[in-house]
A protein has these predicted regions:
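Active-site substrate-recognition segment that forms the wall
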Residues: 11-19, 41-44, 78-83, 183-308
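Short beta-strand to alpha-helix junction loop
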Residues: 56-59, 93-95, 130-149, 258-263, ...
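Dinucleotide-binding Rossmann-like beta1-alpha1 core, especially the glycine-rich loop
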Residues: 41-119, 270-272
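Short hydrophobic core segments
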Residues: 1-3, 26, 177, 184-196, ...
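Flavin (FAD/FMN) cofactor-binding core of flavoprotein oxidoreductases
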Residues: 109, 114-117, 137, 209-210, ...
Length: 351
């Protein structure tokens, strides 16, 4: 039984269904309507700001994404808009030290002005820039919708509309999960509740919501932006249908998902400073999402100190990127196998 039907929970359920007779997902609201729905969908495994222990997992997950996306499309009959054109990073200064070494390992290379103009003709930026060729993006709303359909196709059961609040113990091991109205008996319980993971007893994991405000626009010119474009104060993520996502803030605002018009305007202007035509684009939507953060910005992955109780939460800004590898290693852990990657840095025992 898995509590939480965001991209992590749904991906794990789908993976477990290959090996388990039955898998139940229990979701507080509608599947995939929280952080997964609000994400930009960048597959930013080359990001020099990625915490060091995550780099190996992130690189592996990025390599899994094409096959992962194709399987989901095949099983669901839906498209997820996986784009692999790469990322253009606009730096106030070129990366140095460990950051430079890491992004170089990810096919990072500096861009001369003429090549930058060729790759993004409408980008008006004269500072240092780099091209992270293996990166890309996916439409997270399409991905989670297709993933839910694919999970159902594999036989995963989904109960929505009620939050898991307690894990029932018997003899020191997890035997069931409870919502306000229902008890679900289970041989194994996995907490995939994201920012809400700490609200599920008996272990109060130190997850917290980190608010991010974003907007989506459409420009008159189709193909205005060809790549994900990242700068210190803003990022721009194009979709294949002409929509362009602009984000984002990092706010400690609890579970408040209200949108501030001034903040949205500031993000829109920051994007227009890079690509002036974005300033004339038509706004389609604004929203705020709650990223699941932890004190050290690393996810919680693996078994807990309670037998048969597992956690996969706290992926912060990288849930979409890390979904494939999380599904793999957590499926292995839940089934009692040794995970392909060392999860000790992500153990909940560190808190």
């Amino acid at each position: 039984m898995i509590a939480g039907a965001g991209i992590v929970g749904v991906s794990l359920a789908r993976e477990l269904r290959k090996h388990c007779a039955s898998v139940l997902l229990v979701e507080r609201g509608e599947p995939g309507r929280e952080a997964s729905h609000a994400a930009a969908g960048m597959l930013a495994w080359c990001d020099p700001m990625l915490p060091h222990p995550l780099k190996r997992l992130a690189k592996a997950s990025a390599g899994m994404n094409p096959e992962f996306a194709q399987e989901i499309e095949d099983e669901s009959g839906m498209r997820v808009d996986l784009r692999t054109q790469g990322t253009i990073a606009c730096f106030p200064e070129p990366p140095t030290g460990d950051a430079a070494g890491y992004v170089s390992a990810g096919d990072w290379r500096p861009l001369a002005a003429d090549e930058l103009a060729r790759l993004e003709p409408r980008l008006e930026y004269s500072g240092e820039a780099a091209y992270w060729t293996p990166e890309g993006s996916v439409d997270p709303r399409a991905l989670i919708a297709a993933s839910v359909k694919a999970a159902k196709h594999r036989g995963v059961d989904i109960a929505s509309g009620s939050a898991v609040t307690e894990v029932e113990l018997e003899g020191g091991r997890a035997v069931a999960a409870r919502t306000a109205k229902t008890r679900y008996a289970a041989g194994k319980v996995v907490n995939c509740c994201g920012a809400w993971a700490g609200q599920v007893g008996p272990l109060r994991f130190p997850t917290r919501p980190v608010k991010g405000q974003m907007l989506c626009v459409v420009a008159e010119r189709h193909g205005l932006v060809n790549h994900v474009v990242r700068a210190p104060e803003v990022y721009v993520v194009p979709r294949s249908d002409g929509r362009i996502v602009i984000g984002s803030t990092l706010e400690d605002a609890g579970f408040d998902k209200r949108v501030d018009p001034e903040t949205i305007q500031r993000l829109h202007q920051a994007a227009a400073n890079l690509i002036p035509e974005l300033g004339e684009s038509r706004m389609l939507e604004t929203w705020a999402g709650l990223r699941p953060g932890t004190p050290d910005a690393l996810p919680l992955l693996g078994a807990t100190r309670i037998e048969n109780y597992f956690v996969a939460a706290g992926h912060y800004r990288d849930g979409i990127l890390l979904a494939p590898v999380t599904a793999l290693v957590m499926s292995q852990a839940v089934r009692g196998s040794i995970p392909d990657f060392d999860l000790s840095a992500f153990s909940s025992a560190r808190f």
